[in-house]
Design a protein with these regions (language model features):
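Active-site recognition of the HExxH zinc-binding catalytic motif
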Residues: 61-77
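Metalloprotease/metallohydrolase-associated module, dominated by Zn2+-dependent proteases
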Residues: 37-42, 46, 50-55, 83-141
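Metzincin-family zinc-dependent endopeptidase catalytic domain
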Residues: 1-62
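Glycine-centered secondary-structure boundary/capping sites
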Residues: 10-16, 73, 96, 101
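Surface-exposed patches in mature extracellular/periplasmic domains of secreted proteins
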Residues: 7-9, 78-82
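Short loop/turn segments at secondary-structure transitions that flank enzyme active sites
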Residues: 27, 54, 75-78, 114
Length: 141
């Protein structure tokens, strides 16, 4: 991937970017999971697997933003085994009482927690927030 990114950059007459983001679009027909997207802090590049469907634009933007924040040093806020947002760091409203359902998600959790074992994909970035720990990791606080 780094070689390919270098080749793309070498042929580009514009000044080199700080971060390179590549979106690989997949057919949205059928029920299939996409390969994992990757954001690399070394090399500052993103390879995001997203759906080629206007209806998926909001979800695609969440994936792109999530991976972009990895390049800046943010860590995942979800359980790697289940994909569930980790409480409280992976919750958009960590102090909410009752805790569930959450109305918004933490961008590095990638989903909105509806319960301890249930989550949904956000429809857009407007349903996500950068939590305190993520803000610290990327130097916003």
């Amino acid at each position: 991937m780094r070689y390919w990114a270098w080749r793309v950059q070498a042929e580009d007459p514009l000044p080199p970017p700080d971060i390179q983001i590549f979106a690989l679009y997949h057919d949205s027909a059928g029920e299939h999971a996409l390969p994992d997207s990757v954001g690399l802090s070394t090399g500052l590049m993103v390879l995001a697997h997203v759906y080629a469907d206007r209806a998926a634009q909001g979800e695609n933007n969440v994936v792109l933003a999530h991976e972009l924040l990895h390049t800046l040093g943010a860590s995942d806020k979800y359980d790697a085994g289940t994909g569930q947002p980790r409480a409280p760091d992976g919750l958009g409203e960590p102090l909410r009482q009752p805790r569930y359902p959450q109305n918004i998600g933490e961008i590095m959790a990638g989903r909105i927690a509806l319960g301890p074992e249930e989550a949904t994909m956000p429809a857009s970035l407007q349903e996500m927030r950068v939590g305190a720990i993520t803000a610290d990791e990327i130097g916003w606080r």
